């Protein structure tokens, strides 16, 4: 049963020196530490799923480039096209650019937009973005692959789709009452 109290991350506070992102993170240990979207997303996914904060429940996510995470299905995580709290948003680049991007879903708004937490290789240490459905693209050149679900937060798209539809219905109902 998922914990009902997801704690979103909207600032970098608590990241520097945190073992999820540093000493216990395979990207950091391989020389690809922060700022780096894969290092950040891997660490945040683990931080979200490690309910006892004892560094157990180590993820089996890909340790390759961001655009490879979606196809790394041997990790055993459910995947889908519906956003979920704590899920990894997977994007691939176009044919002539970079290595994709991964981010973590921190909030799902009633209108379907999501807020993601991010880091960028050679760029920003930490930042958030608000992205719109249906493809949740932060910039031109990216292609939406989908979401990898964190099992601690429900584990599958069906659960999250029901929650999202309920929130959407409630938001619509509130708007009707206001008018």
PLM region spans:
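Aromatic- and glycine-rich peptidoglycan recognition patches
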Residues: 8, 102, 108-170, 175, ...
């Amino acid at each position: 049963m998922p914990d009902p109290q997801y704690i979103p991350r909207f600032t970098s506070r608590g990241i520097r020196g945190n073992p999820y992102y540093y000493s216990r993170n395979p990207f950091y240990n391989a020389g690809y530490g922060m700022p780096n979207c894969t290092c950040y997303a891997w660490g945040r996914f683990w931080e979200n799923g490690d309910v006892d904060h004892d560094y157990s429940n180590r993820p089996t996510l890909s340790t390759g480039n961001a655009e490879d995470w979606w196809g790394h299905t041997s990790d055993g995580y459910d995947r889908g096209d519906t956003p979920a709290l704590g899920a990894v948003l997977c994007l691939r680049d176009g044919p002539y650019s970079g290595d994709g991007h991964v981010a973590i879903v921190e909030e799902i708004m009633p209108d379907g937009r999501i807020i993601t937490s991010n880091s960028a290789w050679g760029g920003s240490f930490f930042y958030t973005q608000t992205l719109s459905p249906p493809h949740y693209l932060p910039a031109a050149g990216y292609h939406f692959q989908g979401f990898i679900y964190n099992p601690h937060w429900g584990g599958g798209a069906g659960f999250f789709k029901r929650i999202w539809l309920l929130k959407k219905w409630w938001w619509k109902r509130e708007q009707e009452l206001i008018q």
